[in-house]
Amino acid sequence: MKNVGFIGWRGMVGSVLMQRMVEERDFDAIRPVFFSTSQFGQAAPTFGDTSTGTLQDAFDLDALKALDIIVTCQGGDYTNEIYPKLRESGWQGYWIDAASTLRMKDDAIIILDPVNQDVITDGLNNGVKTFVGGNCTVSLMLMSLGGLFAHNLVDWVSVATYQAASGGGARHMRELLTQMGQLYGHVADELATPSSAILDIERKVTALTRSGELPVDNFGVPLAGSLIPWIDKQLDNGQSREEWKGQAETNKILNTASVIPVDGLCVRVGALRCHSQAFTIKLKKEVSIPTVEELLAAHNPWAKVVPNDRDITMRELTPAAVTGTLTTPVGRLRKLNMGPEFLSAFTVGDQLLWGAAEPLRRMLRQLA
């Protein structure tokens, strides 16, 4: 059995990872060691059937060097501090990371095994020891649209995202819900009075939204009842860093011989933990919609094709329907007026599952 260290297992992504590992009985195949950046020495958690003693110090290089595999959901600052020191010390173990820090390094592979198992296998055969989870929207796009990429049908992709609060973190989710609650509380009496005028209610809500009284420590501006058409840092070319990741990570995941252009706008909306994306896809040749649907549905067990039907779409292609599931549905598939090679698609996926924790879990399963 491999000795596997876990850092950041208490956080949001880490908690989802622990839950999935228990569900799949992954702990049966490893010797887990739990680390903490602040509470080492206290009792370690029990997942599965094995007691794991006490929490170890996440900054203790000697303790970390004793591990065969490290799985970290602790964030980029931790990776920046510990990873170089570990490698410089001669540690030859496997590093599995949820943070973006190492994604684009030449000696790292972005992991999404239903999409790039061939790349992962080649990396393992060539001694690669660093495996990093991808950007959530990129991973979810490839899970849903993987059939088109696998058959080399994609000329380019334009995307508009509808990204959930969870992409920012736990505090962002709390802030969104708090904003929602304050807006409701501000007009609760009027809403309970059928004779009240809805435009008066709207004016009160708008006034509170603009007043500066809503909590915005995390998002910077109100999200409830609104949206934020910018995610992550601003780059010199006018993109946000989130938008830059689309092309950079897609092509690295797929190990493409020539770059597939991917670009668009990334937008934060008031969903809790499911990212949605609207795509305009330029195909390399004309492909019928039934064939597109067959290719998408056959690519992996989680890519579910939703018929382009109003009622079915409203039931099945929403964050409310998909949250907490591993399904990555794709729908609104139709040809666009621009020409027979132009395809529309709409996808939804849980940002914390295939968007974050599940690729890490499955990579660990391969190594253990």
Curated annotation (Swiss-Prot):
Cite the EC number. Answer: 1.2.1.11
Claim: Amino-acid biosynthesis is one of the keywords in the record? yes
What is catalyzed by this enzyme?
Answer: L-aspartate 4-semialdehyde + phosphate + NADP(+) = 4-phospho-L-aspartate + NADPH + H(+)
Instruction: Say yes or no: keyword rRNA processing present.
Output: no
Residues with S-cysteinyl cysteine modification = C136
Q: One biological process GO term for this chain?
A: threonine biosynthetic process
- Alphabetized SUPFAM superfamilies for the sequence: Glyceraldehyde-3-phosphate dehydrogenase-like, C-terminal domain (SSF55347), NAD(P)-binding Rossmann-fold domains (SSF51735)
- Pathway annotation from the record: Amino-acid biosynthesis; L-lysine biosynthesis via DAP pathway; (S)-tetrahydrodipicolinate from L-aspartate: step 2/4; Amino-acid biosynthesis; L-methionine biosynthesis via de novo pathway; L-homoserine from L-aspartate: step 2/3; Amino-acid biosynthesis; L-threonine biosynthesis; L-threonine from L-aspartate: step 2/5
Q: What enzyme class is recorded for this protein?
A: oxidoreductase
Q: Which PROSITE patterns match?
A: ASD
By sequence similarity, the record places it as follows:
Belongs to the aspartate-semialdehyde dehydrogenase family.
Record note on quaternary structure? Homodimer.
What is this protein's name? Aspartate-semialdehyde dehydrogenase
Q: Which gene encodes it?
A: asd
